[in-house]
Amino acid sequence: MKHTPCVPKRRCRMLLAAAVMAALLSPAASPRAEAAAFDAHYTSASLSVQEQEAGNLLNSDRGRYNLPALTIDPELSRIARIKSQDMLAGGYFSHTSPTYGSVRDMLTRFGYPYSAASENIARHSTLEKAQAALISSPGHRRNVLSTTFTKVGIGVATTPEGYVYVTQIFCR
């Protein structure tokens, strides 16, 4: 007899997100354990297809201004992915996470060394529209086109309806 789960996929995702958030909020959770919980679908050295595409869109915008491509850092992308997943699971859209604080707080918490850092976040129906919105906003555009940063982390989370949460963390 074939087992068919009676719980819809959306409910499973919500239960998984709630379980991950509960584990992350426990006092015993270490930064590495937190990252591992959100990294279930990827190794720390890999990017999803959407994250690769988002990185290509960002570097394409830089190329239009004759700027060098930023190096897409896997560890920084892991942190950016955690931020996107946190916004999706937590139902918020802000540069300040109720769980992790600011981008600098997150980098410190996860032990990522940096001398300069900034963050872009976008929520849209497609990656292309998210990047277009970022490049159209003066503050976000400044980050995308900055010569201060040499590395970027890209994190993407997708809602059941197909909307994307994109986090770009820029560092030097």
Residue ranges and their predicted role:
Residues 17-27:
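Bacterial N-terminal signal peptides
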